[in-house]
UniProtKB/Swiss-Prot annotation:
Lumenal side: 44-64, 126-264
Major localization listed first in the record, in broad terms: membrane
Natural source organism: Bos taurus (Bovine)
Protein name per its UniProtKB record: Rod outer segment membrane protein 1
The protein's role, per its UniProt record: Plays a role in rod outer segment (ROS) morphogenesis. May play a role with PRPH2 in the maintenance of the structure of ROS curved disks. Plays a role in the organization of the ROS and maintenance of ROS disk diameter. Involved in the maintenance of the retina outer nuclear layer.
Record's keyword terms, sorted: Cell adhesion, Cell projection, Disulfide bond, Membrane, Sensory transduction, Transmembrane, Transmembrane helix, Vision
Any one GO CC term of the record: cell projection
Coiled-coil regions listed in the entry: none
GO biological process assignments: cell adhesion; visual perception
Subunit annotation: Homodimer; disulfide-linked. Forms a homotetramer. Forms a heterotetramer with PRPH2. Homotetramer and heterotetramer core complexes go on to form higher order complexes by formation of intermolecular disulfide bonds. Interacts with STX3. Interacts with SNAP25.
Mode of membrane association: Multi-pass membrane protein
Domain of life of the organism encoding this protein: Eukaryota
């Protein structure tokens, strides 16, 4: 049974392999740590912006899986640096001989699987942000006025902070506020004819105005912020709703948050790809180094050439060996049964 992808390693290539693995492992530690920070940053951002994402949006799974994958990659890099450094010393390597094989299996199956899953999520999940933000921001705008409703008390504060921090207004623009009631009934006078007319002017019985909350105002504008009667061209002669202006934020929060979160997801996806490449190289190098040293009794500077490989035999041979070992002692087929020898006849005594 021939080994899979064998590689002959003389003395100097073995030493260079161990030294290169040590540098590559520390590079994996660095990249894994940066990926860990990127995952944590995206997770914190989603924790702050979770109110504006639909509960059914699965995007939050990306930083969680990426966090676990980067932590395993960081651990793989630390193991690789320790094992490659110890392989250069015949006295330090023996403790690694018994644990390096299981660690390689765990790193390949666990770490590789998590990285592949995280990369798949980084490619697939950003597309779900569009509908998730659309639904979440729409719900946030509707509940802006519910400052006294249990469970919705913080909706106004969170949306005001969002618009001020990200320089956005409404879901797709400031006109989104015209179609919802964002003033609480607590502050409306039911005896005011204007209030009654506005409530009776729509079938839903909402108090709709052509104004926006204060958080839509640009504090850096040189002019006073115009918040009411924005659709009346005669109310504010200097304000033209058809032209860009400095008073209100021009972008909607959907566009701003979508670009922000997709940018973070893209950065995280690139970091995961680099981490996957480095982890693959480290695991392959460790496997070749381990199998080469096993042929030399764990001594890297042993005499002669050593052969490193990925698997001691092909997949078919490995499965056949495992099957034979699990099936117990071999029982020959009926055609293979050797003929039984007849017992020798006993000689009768002569009379």
């Amino acid at each position: 049974m021939a080994p899979v992808l064998p590689l002959v390693l003389p003395l100097q290539p073995r030493i260079r392999l161990a030294q290169g693995l040590w540098l590559l492992s520390w590079l994996l530690v660095l990249v894994g740590g940066l990926t860990l920070l990127c995952s944590g940053h995206l997770l914190v951002q989603l924790w702050h912006l979770g109110t504006f994402l639909a509960p059914s949006c699965p995007f939050s799974a990306l930083p969680q899986v990426a966090l676990a994958a980067s932590a395993v990659a960081l651990g793989t890099g630390l193991v690789g640096s320790g094992a490659s450094r110890a392989s250069l010393d015949a006295e330090q390597y023996p403790p690694w001989r018994g644990v390096l094989g299981p660690l390689l299996v765990a790193g390949t199956a666990g770490g590789g699987g998590l990285l592949v899953l995280a990369l798949g999520l980084a490619l697939a999940l950003p597309g779900t942000l569009d509908t998730g933000l659309e639904e979440g921001l729409g719900s946030a705008l509707v509940h802006y006025k519910d400052t006294e409703v249990p469970g919705r008390c913080q909706a106004k504060r969170l949306l005001d902070e969002l618009q001020l921090r990200h320089h956005c207004c409404g879901r797709h623009g400031y006109k989104d506020w015209f179609g919802i009631q964002w003033v609480s009934n607590r502050y409306l006078d039911p005896n005011d004819p204007d209030v009654v007319d506005r409530i009776q002017s729509n079938v839903e019985g909402l108090y709709l105005i052509d104004g926006v909350p204060f958080s839509c105002c640009n504090p850096h504008s040189p002019r006073p912020c115009l918040q009411s009667q924005l659709s009346d061209p005669h109310a504010h002669p200097l304000f033209d709703p058809r032209q860009p202006n400095l008073n209100l934020w021009s972008q909607g929060c959907h566009e701003v948050l979508l670009g922000h979160l997709q940018g973070l997801a893209s950065t995280l996806g690139n970091m995961l790809a680099v981490t996957f490449l480095l982890q693959t190289l480290v695991l392959l190098g460790l496997r070749y180094l381990q199998t080469a040293l096993e042929g030399l009794g764990g001594v890297i500077d042993g005499e002669g050439e050593a052969q490193g490989y990925l698997f001691p035999a092909g997949l078919k041979d490995m499965l056949k060996t495992a099957w034979l070992q699990g099936a117990g002692p071999h029982r020959p087929a009926p055609g293979e049964t050797p003929p039984e020898e007849k017992p020798p006849k006993e000689c009768l005594p002569e009379a």
